Amino acid sequence: MEKRAAAGPEGAPGARAPLAVVCLVNLFLTGRLSSAVPALAACSGKLEQHTERRGVIYSPAWPLNYPPGTNCSWYIQGDRGDMITISFRNFDVEESHQCSLDWLLLGPAAPPRQEAFRLCGSAIPPAFISARDHVWIFFHSDASSSGQAQGFRLSYIRGKLGQASCQTDEFRCDNGKCLPGPWQCNMVDECGDGSDEGNCSAPASEPPGSLCPGGTFPCSGARSTRCLPVERRCDGTQDCGDGSDEAGCPDLACGRRLGSFYGSFASPDLFGAARGPSDLHCTWLVDTQDPRRVLLQLELRLGYDDYVQVYEGLGERGDRLLQTLSYRSNHRPVSLEAAQGRLTVAYHARARSAGHGFNATYQVKGYCLPWEQPCGSSSEGDDGSTGEQGCFSEPQRCDGWWHCASGRDEQGCPACPPDQYPCEGGSGLCYAPADRCNNQKSCPDGADEKNCFSCQPGTFHCGTNLCIFETWRCDGQEDCQDGSDEHGCLAAVPRKVITAALIGSLVCGLLLVIALGCAFKLYSLRTQEYRAFETQMTRLEAEFVRREAPPSYGQLIAQGLIPPVEDFPVYSASQASVLQNLRTAMRRQMRRHASRRGPSRRRLGRLWNRLFHRPRAPRGQIPLLTAARTSQTVLGDGLLQAAPGPVPDPPVPNTDTGSPREAGDGPPSGSGHAPEVGPSVPPPPLNLRDPEYRPEDKERKACVDPLEDSPAPVDTPPEPCLAQDPHPQTPTASGIQDPHSAEPLGVCRSPPPTCSPILEASDDEALLVC
């Protein structure tokens, strides 16, 4: 049933906005709209508004039994001056005292101002005619309801009185009201003046059974208005004058073997009262003696715990079970087929069940019962077969439900044009053949999408004779009631998973772009802030802190800049050879390093330091930059130290010549005072020297170019360090240490050497080696 949600008669437009949002979100995530609609039905706590000229309204779960504890509301809105007419097609609401449990309300106002027009029971109410342009409809089922009532189905039409003409499928009353054609001569006054029932050419052959109250049935005599209890139906006694209460009664025996090519049977409690204190188990064996398929049709009225099992072949075998039917299939026809003309029907009912069993008919497929018409276009053959397998009875003619695959039982109906089919429920609406089984409802009750034998292109045929979109097949969600749209599917990722992954990747990509943008923005702000406070002094300071570290002691020895001392002894020529190899490898590495460095690499290093090593010095501080100048060379405990700064005053030379010492053997001289020379233990002689080392080459090797094998030329020959030389620039080899001096033993002060410094083309600093 097509439903439209709204907040009220005046608030309908406002209610469509949330519906549109829900539908768009559902379409984006699942690729469909249908799953969002049921949540907005009339029984979900929201009002359902109808503004169509004609329509059909059903109780919840129709044609199944309505559930207990349900509240539904509908609102029919017409134009100004319209008159609304409501006619009931079916009505079965559980009866109670003064309709206090389950009820249906109709009127022009909402509760509590609702007029007391409350309905319940099984008798079809008379037509409801509203002189106003709107009608409220409320349905309520109590939580204690048994759930065994089917509900209701009603049709409505709105329009003005005094109309000169009506549509082709409508009937015009004497007061000018237009009604659907099927409403004429139905023994219900919908015109209000009786004109729709006064000009009937022939009275109905039997009054509608709904004129009798619930739990009764009418006699079929033309003039009879007698209603009898259902217990007196098919009880072996004629209670109606014409014997109609015993006509066409099925076999009520509890189980039997049936051998005809067609027949009928029913459960023993079909027309009986409430079941006794014992359970009921019955089995029927059907053998048509025909190799062709047998067709079984059932009408169920089962209780909550009752069920019917149908098996293929003779005998109850689990591997041949066709279907198990329960109370959920009540009030709708059920058709099953079995191969080779054999089947078994088993009925199981609980004690004191409120159900009334079932009624069944069977026939060989391709044959029609005497009171049925064939679905095939050809006439019946000599053997009773038809061109198309299938049959329909006269009550099934033009009822809106396709009983034939070709739709022959719905063709040529008086309420529709020749090329159209009627909707179910006698609403007078019709639809074209192209609208049949395309998964788009054209009838308010969706009759054009029910019992589909074939589907339109682009749709998939479910095992329950429903059609869905082809794109819904194998999408990971069961859209057919039996799940046949997900059978035989390859292992594929569901569409919703793909959609979720796509959305997740888009969100992650967006977050990544935002993060990168923030990072570049922060870098830009930091660069601008750094440049705003950048001065010439800060740039010089940055250049100063990037100076390379001096070489280590091992590198100096390997380069031949200093001789090995006691803590790095050389005992043999093999060790000297290894040391020479280390020197050669270090020279090659330094040449390779000097050839690779260039301006581009220096600029890259500066950029890297600016990005990740921002100077930490306080802003405005001027770095003290002095030229690197070696004023003294200290040869102490195996370390080469360069003490920058001005050359201090020379110490007082040692006048003690009684025990001459070599330079560096005694304590250094003081600051002008000659300390007493006492007995002291001389340091161990430098015995572990390079075998090729000579004292006269000491000063010459101090100015060796690390990149060349030959010593660098000097301008002036080195002068020996004599303690007796009074010249302040002369090196002193005194072994006496001045107590006010912080210099270690063996200090040789000398003027700045004239040897050329080691320079690299790409470095800003120069390595001065003495």
UniProtKB/Swiss-Prot annotation:
GO terms for biological process: endocytosis; negative regulation of fat cell differentiation; negative regulation of gene expression; positive regulation of gene expression; positive regulation of osteoblast differentiation. Residues 639-753 are annotated as: Disordered. GO terms for cellular component: clathrin-coated pit; plasma membrane. CDD domains: CUB, LDLa. The chain crosses the membrane at residues 497-517. Keywords: Coated pit, Disulfide bond, Endocytosis, Glycoprotein, Membrane, Receptor, Repeat, Signal, Transmembrane, Transmembrane helix. The keyword Transcription does not apply. Residues 37-496 are extracellular. It is a single-pass type I membrane protein. Disulfide bonds join 43-72, 99-120, 166-178, 173-191, 185-200, 212-227, 219-240, 234-249, 254-282, 416-430, 423-443, 437-452, 455-467, 462-480, 474-489. It comes from the Eukaryota. Residues 689-703 have a biased composition (Basic and acidic residues). Its main location: membrane. PROSITE patterns: CUB, LDLRA_1, LDLRA_2. Probable receptor, which may be involved in the internalization of lipophilic molecules and/or signal transduction. Its precise role is however unclear, since it does not bind to very low density lipoprotein (VLDL) or to LRPAP1 in vitro. This is Low-density lipoprotein receptor-related protein 3.
